[in-house]
């Protein structure tokens, strides 16, 4: 009888152990990566590679940052950049957007293709070799010409960066815009994207 009781006790203990080990291990959900903020040149390098996959002769005609709830353009960086490219061979233009935000659109996203016209001044392509000055350096220059004073008074003012070619002056320009967009702004400073020199306060 004693042996029977001991055998039954052993079986109960074994069942308890097996039930403990049978419990599925709790798997921790991977934490989303924090938002990534980069300068214009850093984003452009990624976007240029993507554009060359579309057309081997693709050249940029505009690079611009995007203002979002999490990205206000401080320190010359943004969480979203869009570069537009033209291809004379394919007679097309196409935009690519890089996003470092915590969303499903994170990474590089291509836009739709449109028709390219060499005579269109708004799609004037330029050689990437002219881009020697980054957006954070352009901001430093703009800060010395009114930006620092403006942000001291209104620190919540977003800063937007637009890079394009000026056909009249034949130079690549960073437009550092203190405001919501190219038309709605409090200050707009033009900086040479090859030398970093101050050009003018734009009207």
Regions picked out by a protein language model, each given a short descriptive name:
Residues 5, 17-203:
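Long, terminal "pre-/pro-" and other extracytoplasmic accessory regions
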Residues 1-15:
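Sec-dependent bacterial lipoprotein signal peptides
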């Amino acid at each position: 009888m004693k042996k029977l009781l001991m055998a039954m006790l052993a079986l109960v203990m074994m069942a308890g152990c097996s039930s403990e080990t049978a419990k599925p291990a709790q798997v921790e959900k991977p934490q989303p990566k924090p938002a990534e903020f980069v300068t214009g040149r850093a984003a452009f390098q990624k976007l240029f590679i993507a554009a060359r996959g579309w057309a081997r002769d693709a050249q940029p005609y505009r690079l611009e940052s995007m203002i979002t709830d999490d990205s206000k353009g401080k320190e010359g960086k943004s969480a979203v950049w869009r570069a537009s490219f033209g291809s004379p061979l394919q007679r097309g233009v196409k935009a690519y957007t890089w996003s470092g935000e915590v969303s499903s659109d994170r990474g590089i996203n291509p836009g739709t293709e449109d028709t390219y016209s060499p005579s269109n001044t708004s799609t004037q392509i330029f050689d990437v070799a002219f881009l020697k000055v980054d957006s954070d350096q352009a901001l430093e220059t703009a800060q010395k010409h009114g930006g620092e004073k403006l942000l001291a008074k209104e620190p919540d003012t977003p800063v937007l960066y637009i890079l394009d070619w000026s056909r009249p002056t034949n130079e690549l320009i960073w437009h550092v815009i203190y405001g919501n967009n190219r038309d709605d702004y409090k200050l707009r400073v033009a900086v040479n994207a090859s030398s970093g020199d101050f050009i003018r306060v734009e009207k």
